[in-house]
């Protein structure tokens, strides 16, 4: 929870800086660092794909001129977002479609894969919303661009089945809350 609060404070500071201010680079670094250091992140699961195909695929949404995966720094923020949306992210059985990704899976699988695919992320919501690329997150954290895969995932990648690979990592590493 403390990391989440610190992250929100960093985003708020960043948003107050004028675009001409050189301190934005430092503020950005601290946001990326706090985000990278979260023990777990939370995603909202696409209701249609979950109910029709049993897939736990994170929501990919648009914000202003950017599109990206919606990621939350805490379960509370994810739950508040889901509750504001009515039944849009609630399964027929009443289950809120919120998934958790542990730090190791996020760092070692999701971020490098999303960076390779040139995806963005939208962190949190409302006044704490921050948008950036996974590629820049990897670069700032000086992390490896290689992602860890098991044999089944390696076979999917060798066959060129990127969608199958993505569905598999979501199935294995996203836990519904």
What do the PLM-derived regions correspond to, one by one?
Residues 1-177:
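An interfacial alpha-helical scaffold signature
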């Amino acid at each position: 929870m403390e990391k989440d609060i610190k992250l929100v404070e960093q985003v708020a500071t960043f948003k107050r800086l004028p675009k001409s201010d050189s301190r934005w680079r430092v503020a950005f670094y601290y946001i990326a660092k706090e985000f990278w250091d979260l023990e777990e992140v939370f995603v909202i699961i696409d209701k249609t794909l979950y109910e029709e195909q049993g897939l736990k695929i994170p929501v990919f949404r648009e914000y202003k001129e950017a599109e990206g995966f919606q990621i939350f720094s805490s379960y509370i923020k994810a739950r508040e977002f889901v509750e504001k949306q009515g039944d849009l992210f609630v399964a027929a059985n009443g289950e809120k479609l919120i998934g958790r990704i542990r730090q190791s899976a996020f760092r070692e699988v999701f971020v490098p894969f999303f960076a390779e695919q040139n995806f963005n992320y939208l962190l949190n919501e409302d006044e704490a919303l921050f948008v950036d690329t996974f590629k820049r997150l990897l670069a700032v954290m000086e992390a490896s661009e290689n992602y860890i895969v098991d044999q089944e995932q390696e076979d999917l990648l060798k066959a060129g089945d990127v969608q199958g690979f993505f569905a598999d990592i979501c199935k294995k590493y996203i836990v519904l809350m």
